[in-house]
Amino acid sequence: MKFFTLGGKQFWEDVFYYQKWRIQRHYRTKKYRLLDKWDICRATGSFEECRQAFVQMVEVFEIPRQTGSLVILLHGLGQNKSIFRPLWRALENEGYQVAAINYPSTRKSMKAHVDQLDFFLTHVEDIDEVSFITYKTGCLLLRHLLNTSYQWTTKFNIGKIININPTNTGSDFCNIASNFGLFRFIFGPMLKECTPFKAKRIPKLPTGIPFGIVFCETLKDRILKPIIKRYEGIKIPGDLTEEDFSLNYTHLKNKHLNVFDNPKLQEKCIQFLKQGKF
């Protein structure tokens, strides 16, 4: 069985990754499929059947063994892994192994996404260190993940963490949109979980991990800013700001529709992964 796919988007979740090959699970039917690095489906069935099919493909395609560290990219609500394409290419050009993870952010709760990532990390092979780069609300998902005890935490070290345009204090857009049924239908249960009220309840990232933040405003951010400003709640003196979550942060100018097309942002991410500082 071979057919081209679009890589999952909002209906398939990544549960296994090895040298750009991935096993995905459909969020509703729970069926699995094996995709090669060109997003061509090579097998379907249970996870074990897809895993066994991959083992056979290792010999057929002479897939090399992966070693060392892996950089995992986590997108935000309503997005998919494709948004990271310019960044993951830049990272690969620097020799990094990169896994941009698809998760159906508009279909399931944050707890369900954390369970998916737990399954994914449990099945990571031949890696001794994992670093994370998150975008927008992906930072909240990572905080949930790293503050829960899992078996995979003894398999490898957590290297470095980069938040890009994070919503660690919660999203004012999600707060406004959650009041409207249409937006709740479009964005799903995670919409309410990304509001400032809910974000405050999520523990911060564990200490001791090099953690940096990149602020790089997008065109959409500039368009939405006056609208959000008009309807946002009252800011209480002493409330945390995004800068309060890390002493290591940087602000970048941006003229690109996709923030990851910004060469300066790519440079800063590579710099932090190498040095642990901007």
What are these language model-derived features?
Residues 81, 107-111, 259:
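Loop/helix-junction capping segments adjacent to catalytic residues or to phosphate/diphosphate-binding pockets
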Residues 84-86, 144-146, 175-176, 225-227:
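Short amphipathic alpha-helical segments
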Residues 76-77, 217:
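Structural motif
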Residues 206-278:
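C-terminal catalytic-base region of ester-bond hydrolases, centering on the histidine
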